[in-house]
């Protein structure tokens, strides 16, 4: 299992969509170090294939991408619903033999 998270940059109205195998609060603290902007952990979503979900979220929001993993989201409150929606797609695909190899490589223990 892993965690996909949404962190808000309060000064720039941007959101980071990221993934961690560890504690998202520790990840926030690492990002905050040396960063003059105030960052806040908004949402976390635990799932079996966090790297796949993160990639799908980045693709979903590519039109509002600011820089790397930072996005200008209009409605960040939809993040958990979007995670659940995309995660259900991942769940349905993981049993498909054409996709199962990729999923086994990316799976976290």
Give residue spans per PLM region.
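Non-catalytic accessory segments flanking enzymatic or RNA/DNA-binding domains
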Residues: 1-109
């Amino acid at each position: 299992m892993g965690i996909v998270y949404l962190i808000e940059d309060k000064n720039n109205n941007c959101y980071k969509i990221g993934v961690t195998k560890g504690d998202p609060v520790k990840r926030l603290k690492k990002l905050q170090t040396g960063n003059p902007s105030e960052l806040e952990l908004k949402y976390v979503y635990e799932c079996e294939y966090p790297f796949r979900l993160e990639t799908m979220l980045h693709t979903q929001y590519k039109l509002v991408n600011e820089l790397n993993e930072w996005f200008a989201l209009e409605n960040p409150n939809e993040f958990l619903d979007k995670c659940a929606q995309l995660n259900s797609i991942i769940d349905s695909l993981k049993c498909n033999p054409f996709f199962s190899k990729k999923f086994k490589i990316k799976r976290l223990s």
